[in-house]
């Protein structure tokens, strides 16, 4: 089992967002958390990604107890998240956003050619067509969603969390 969340409780004042939630995930599994608005789905995902702290409960990754203080802690354990609200640098290119913090360099400089090639290969492998040279703020929201997904895939995450993955997509983009 790569992920185990035991008895997770999260409250906001008198509002209970999560009440003793248990989640188990094995390698290769896909898990969907379904519920009404306000049911606590995003809260449990944010807890796993280190954006929120549970009031009580335990999280285990590959059998090891974890305490995530921030997304960097979560990412270090192989957890990536495609957020409902994009976390992109609008003035940068698609490629720069995808490889940010893990970019290939030529000496101390950004190796633009290698990074573009890597993004093209990643895009082709996952059939998520993007223009690596496009400026993010000029891209439609459906394309920005693809950039978010490719950015997470580039990090080689073992666990990928999607929060409302199709919320901003057109029906055609969802089918793609």
Could you say what each language-model-derived stretch is?
Residues 1-176:
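Glycine-rich phosphate-binding loops of nucleotide-dependent enzymes
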